[in-house]
Amino acid sequence: LAIGGGSVIDTAKAIAHGLKYPQNDIWDIWTKKITLTNTTPMGSIVTLAAAGSETSDSAVLTNEQTGQKRGLSTPFNRPCFAIMNPQLTYSAPNYQKACGIADILMHTLERYFAKEQNNYLTDYIAEGLLKDVITQAPIMINEPTNYIAHSEIMYAGSLSHNDITGLGRTKDFSVHKFGHELSAKYNATHGASLTAIWSSWARYIYQKDVQRFCHLGKILFNIDTLNKTDETIALETIKYFEDFFTSLN
């Protein structure tokens, strides 16, 4: 039973796998030297809205001996149950709440800006989730016992990483991979490492799909498009995200 946030839940997943493979180094599963075919049932009680590990098929571990941080996706990673009471997240420090908010947004954005975009409903779900998180996040930070804001963010955390926001497309988790390297080397909180990378990544790739960045900016930030080029709107969208993350401290 995991009681905590994403790191605690992911650790419990690793322990559950390790119980079935006592003769092996658990890291061999994460480096795919061993194919996982079974696990021990585990559940979670969530105390931080962030990674969505309580409903996801992924788990991330850091090897402190090698300085590596790696993710593993497998159906065996999904917990048997998750108890999600927003009141259990009230006491988390604001910095951790902010990092969790960033992770939720990134889990959705890295699916939204995938190469294949073949499902409109998936887009609508992702856009609704992003808009809700951006709306509720400052309330959550400024009102530490606001039940509605905390429940919305907690719900979004699960939806952002159970793959409902990525149905019908492949995922591009390049920002997460860069973030893992930063976290492993500098012991940075996961969400913070992602915000350090995302805007540079976005400015590097936005011309691959300028229209998509424009579309998202209009929906999320009501960007005034009068007499502006698509490129200008796309870059404004990226800047709005930067300013949002900065506002969360």
Regions picked out by a protein language model, each given a short descriptive name:
Residues 1-24, 139-150:
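N-terminal small/polar loop signature for handling phosphorylated ligands or for N-terminal nucleophile
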Residues 7-13, 52-55, 171, 175-176, ...:
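Short glycine/serine/threonine-rich phosphate/pyrophosphate-binding segments
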Residues 20-121, 215:
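A glycine/threonine-rich phosphate-anchoring loop and its flanking beta-alpha core
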Residues 84, 239-242:
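Alpha-helix-centered segments that form part of catalytic cores
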Residues 111, 115-240:
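Active-site segments that bind and position negatively charged phosphate/pyrophosphate groups
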Residues 241-249:
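Short, intrinsically disordered, charge-balanced linker/junction segments flanking boundaries
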